[in-house]
Amino acid sequence: MAPDGSIARPTVLTGPSGVGKGTLVARLRERHPEIWLSVSATTRAPRSGEIDGIHYFFHSKERFNKLVQSGGLLEWAEFAGNCYGTPREPVSERVANGIPVLLEIELEGARQVRKSLPEAIQIFLAPPSVEELEKRIRGRGTEAEEAIQRRLKRAQEELEAQTEFDAVIVNDDLETALAELEKQMNLTIS
């Protein structure tokens, strides 16, 4: 059950690269360790230190394709020759047991989840402005100009889709965004 005794609803969180999804989710999980963050399945090889079932569910292409064909994934996509997706079963099990579930996924994945899990709360995390988003991306200092421009172009496309979501949270201040996310997820501070 959710904190108020209602049935737990899964929550989908998406937003452009650099908006602060990872930071917000980490802070949310500090305050609410009961939240289960979905674990993606992938066909890519594990990197050093990655543990199957913790960081990803590592599958062969054949096993992944069987999951796709059987409806075993809530959403999936292919990036750089590898497939990634959200397994349905672990999400369904936790929701059935009243555990709050959070899916931090890309826009296209969120659209697929809307069809496969219509009861999910869909939240879009937006930057205060495109200029601030660019500042954050450049502030990382990890990408070439061409990659930054690609991210900004994609971010503009994603920002145009925010009206598709149940709620939009502007990540101008981490604590304010956190309080709004907690409210949307019907979480209480213990």
UniProtKB/Swiss-Prot annotation:
Chief place where the protein resides: cytoplasm
Function: Essential for recycling GMP and indirectly, cGMP. (Microbial infection) Catalyzes the phosphorylation of dZMP to dZDP, when the bacterium is infected by a phage that produces the substrate for the synthesis of dZTP (2- amino-2'-deoxyadenosine 5'-triphosphate), which is then used by the phage as a DNA polymerase substrate.
Protein name per its UniProtKB record: Guanylate kinase
Metabolic or biological pathway: Purine metabolism
Binding residues for ATP: G15, P16, S17, G18, V19, G20, K21, G22
Keyword Nucleotide-binding: yes
Keyword Transferase carried by entry: yes
Domain annotation Guanylate kinase-like: ranges: 8-186
Top enzyme class: transferase
The EC number(s) this enzyme carries: 2.7.4.8
UniProt keyword list: ATP-binding, Cytoplasm, Kinase, Nucleotide-binding, Transferase
PANTHER family per record: GUANYLATE KINASE, GUANYLATE KINASE-RELATED
GO terms of molecular function: ATP binding; guanylate kinase activity
Signal peptide: none
Family under the similarity heading: Belongs to the guanylate kinase family.
Catalytic activity: GMP + ATP = GDP + ADP; dZMP + ATP = dZDP + ADP
